[in-house]
């Protein structure tokens, strides 16, 4: 019962709607009141204005002096300076060339940053250092001094005086050798300069001599104990052995550094 009433009312509403709009859409389309589909075509003047650029530059207003000169008649033959400059200006100047960054941006390339990145600012430019000396090389200035020390024997190269040269019968020190006194100060300076490089060589002659004296300490002490100079040398070797002595390696005493023996202890 209820459904039939709802259906009848719906049909009645549809009939009333059809009667109210009967023929009106056709009349509105013919009269131009109905909005037509599609984009509207602008008139010719609007198209010409759009092609000329937007906004279109209008006429510039001349200054007041030029306006007064044009309105005042008769006026003097020679116009004032402002009017002459205005007449000589002509069309507006062309636009200036854009900067390089703007041109690169327009071409699709990112501009190069003028400031270098932080890592390049921290590090200084690479410097060319002098080549380091190899272990088997020695400075050119100390070559002559090194040859002289090697020619004097093991005791002269190590800097420890021999027992026979310094110990006499009366126990006094013997005078220095004449070839030592003949050395110049320059040779001594070059010898002192070249000594650190020789000390770094574990296979050098001086290192082997020092190692032999430390191993045979008792023998050196017995030989040099006869005189005052010899006793001083023995005491020096004894103190050096005490300073450099360690727990030992294969029954041998180690030197101060522990690398000249070559035993790897």
Swiss-Prot record:
Region (Disordered): 153-211
Residue numbers covered by the propeptide annotation in the UniProt entry: 24-30, 44-50, 64-70, 81-87, 100-106, 118-120, 126, 132-241
Transmembrane regions listed in the UniProt entry: none
Extent of Basic and acidic residues compositional bias: 196-206
Compositionally biased region (Low complexity): 184-194
Cleaved signal peptide residues: 1-23
PROSITE patterns (UniProt xref): NATRIURETIC_PEPTIDE (PS00263)
Tissue: Expressed by the venom gland.
Protein name: Bradykinin-potentiating and C-type natriuretic peptides
Protein location: Secreted; Cytoplasm, Cytosol
Presence of the UniProt keyword Transmembrane in the record: no
Keywords of the record: Cleavage on pair of basic residues, Cytoplasm, Disulfide bond, G-protein coupled acetylcholine receptor impairing toxin, G-protein coupled receptor impairing toxin, Hypotensive agent, Metalloenzyme inhibitor, Metalloprotease inhibitor, Protease inhibitor, Pyrrolidone carboxylic acid, Repeat, Secreted, Signal, Toxin, Vasoactive, Vasodilator
Residues found modified as Pyrrolidone carboxylic acid: 31, 51, 71, 88, 107, 121, 127
Keyword Signal among record annotations: yes
Molecular function terms, GO-annotated: hormone activity; peptidase inhibitor activity; toxin activity
Disulfide bonds: 249-265
Superkingdom of origin organism: Eukaryota
Effect recorded for residue 80 to A: Important decrease in ability to enhance AsS activity
Taxonomic placement: Eukaryota, Metazoa, Chordata, Craniata, Vertebrata
Any one GO CC term of the record: cytosol
Pfam families according to UniProt: ANP
InterPro entries in UniProt: Natr_peptide, Natr_peptide_CS
Family: In the N-terminal section; belongs to the bradykinin-potentiating peptide family.
Biological process according to GO: cGMP biosynthetic process; receptor guanylyl cyclase signaling pathway; regulation of blood pressure; vasodilation
